[in-house]
Swiss-Prot record:
Keyword terms, alphabetized: Metal-binding, Metal-thiolate cluster
Amino-acid positions noted as binding a divalent metal cation 3 in the UniProt annotation, renumbered to this chain: C13, C17, C22, C27
Top-level taxonomic group: Eukaryota
Gene behind the chain: MT-A
Binding site for a divalent metal cation 6: C35, C39, C42, C59
Protein name per the record: Metallothionein
Metal-binding recorded as keyword: yes
Residues where a divalent metal cation 7 binds: C48, C56, C58, C59
Lineage: Eukaryota, Metazoa, Chordata, Craniata, Vertebrata
InterPro entries per the UniProt record, alphabetical: Metalthion_dom_sf, Metalthion_dom_sf_vert, Metalthion_vert, Metalthion_vert_metal_BS
Organism: Ambystoma mexicanum
Amino acid sequence: MDCACATGGSCSCAGSCKCENCKCTSCKKSCCSCCPSECEKCGQGCVCKGGSSEKCSCCN
């Protein structure tokens, strides 16, 4: 799964995740997809490639 983000650092994904090219600004938690833009705790401008059940743990 390719997590395309506009700007920022990198997402830290779990070993089983296929997250590539993810450049969330502040989300460093394990995740399979970028945090959606409405997540205030995570980097803005990210595109969520997964379903609602695949949100980054830092969005909870």
